[in-house]
């Protein structure tokens, strides 16, 4: 068994844990950066074919190694960040055309990485989300803000680990933030702020048809974001059956095999904040004491059968 992990930062906790899980199962794992790859479409042996090349080293290296044709793989595990989404998904498309097993296909990955598009898909399936809006460049900023109550949440449409998520507590501040984002040509969306859940949310880790673990995350004092990467803390919790079903439904609606589903408790019930295609393992493993990495690899092996 030979697996390819697409990852820019192999030293990260999640990548190292998945690497260890493969080693424990005597699986060969190659960890390669999709940004160092080239996909070639050409007629080879009188037939149109696709080839994938990889080039090690850095752009500034004077004696950089020549690109090499990549070998075949049995399965692909995407773990690339937001900045690598476009190239990473094109590499996933390459392997999909070759019928290689992929954990989280490119269509689902692209959708999950677009916060607004994913919210639209969730809402179309009547999955509860916070009141949200997206406006075109010629729509009045003031009129856009008036669709929400203050304070409100402003999010960039791409971003992870709490980066690009801002809480605005006045109309003046909201206008200033939106004008800045528009000037920088950064797509953004607005959401109602769930006051009653300030600084706290839930991460449900979904693998296949079940929630394998769930944690409650609490943000730092005076920070409404509960992300672990922003300094938040986590404690393991048990979701009831309905809550687990909502998390699994959200992941499946986006099309993901493995997902981190972020939930928030409101006066209207449980809401889905977003669905992550590349959820980190650090917080969930340390809080739950479970071998989530091993469960992911076992699920990938089951997909291969």
From Swiss-Prot:
EC number assigned by the record: 6.3.2.-
Required cofactor names: Mg(2+); Mn(2+)
Top-rank EC class of the record's enzyme: ligase
Record-given protein name: Probable alpha-L-glutamate ligase
Record PROSITE patterns: ATP_GRASP
Free-text remark on how the cofactor is bound: Binds 2 magnesium or manganese ions per subunit.
GO molecular function, one term: metal ion binding
Superkingdom as given in the UniProt entry: Bacteria
Binding site for ATP: 155, 192-193, 201, 225-227
Organism of provenance: Haemophilus ducreyi (strain 35000HP / ATCC 700724)
Residue positions binding Mg(2+) 2: 274, 276
Domain ATP-grasp: 119-301
Keywords: ATP-binding, Ligase, Magnesium, Manganese, Metal-binding, Nucleotide-binding, Protein biosynthesis
Stretches of the chain forming a coiled coil according to its record: none
InterPro entries, per the entry: ATP-grasp, ATP-grasp_RimK-type, ATP_grasp_subdomain_1, RimK, Rimk_N, Rp_bS6_RimK/Lys_biosynth_LsyX
């Amino acid at each position: 068994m030979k697996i390819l992990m697409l990852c820019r930062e192999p030293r990260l906790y999640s990548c190292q844990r998945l690497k260890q899980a493969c080693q424990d199962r005597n699986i060969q794992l190659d960890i390669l950066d999709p940004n160092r790859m080239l996909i070639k479409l050409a007629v080879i042996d009188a037939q149109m074919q696709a080839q994938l090349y990889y080039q090690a080293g850095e752009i500034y290296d004077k004696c950089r190694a020549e690109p090499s044709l990549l070998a075949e793989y049995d399965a692909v595990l995407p773990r690339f960040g937001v900045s690598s989404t476009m190239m990473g998904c094109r590499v996933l498309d390459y392997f999909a055309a070759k019928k290689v097993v992929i954990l989280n296909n490119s269509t689902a990955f692209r959708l999950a990485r677009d916060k607004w598009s994913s919210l639209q898909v969730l809402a179309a399936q009547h999955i509860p989300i916070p009141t949200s809006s997206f406006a075109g460049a010629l729509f009045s900023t003031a009129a856009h803000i008036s669709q929400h109550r203050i304070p409100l949440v402003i999010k960039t449409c791409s971003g992870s680990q709490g980066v690009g998520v801002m809480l605005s507590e006045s109309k003046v501040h909201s206008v200033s933030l939106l004008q800045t984002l528009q000037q920088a040509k950064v797509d953004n969306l607005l959401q109602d702020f769930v006051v009653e859940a300030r600084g706290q949310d839930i991460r449900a880790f979904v693998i296949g048809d079940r929630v394998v673990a769930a944690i409650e995350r609490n943000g730092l004092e005076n920070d409404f974001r509960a992300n672990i990467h922003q300094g938040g803390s986590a404690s393991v919790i048990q979701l009831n059956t309905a809550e687990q079903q909502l998390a699994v439904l959200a992941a499946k609606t986006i099309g993901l095999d493995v997902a981190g589903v972020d939930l928030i408790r409101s006066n209207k019930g449980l809401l889905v904040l977003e669905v992550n295609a590349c959820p980190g393992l650090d917080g969930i493993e340390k809080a739950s004491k479970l071998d989530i990495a091993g469960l992911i690899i076992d699920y990938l092996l089951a997909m291969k059968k």
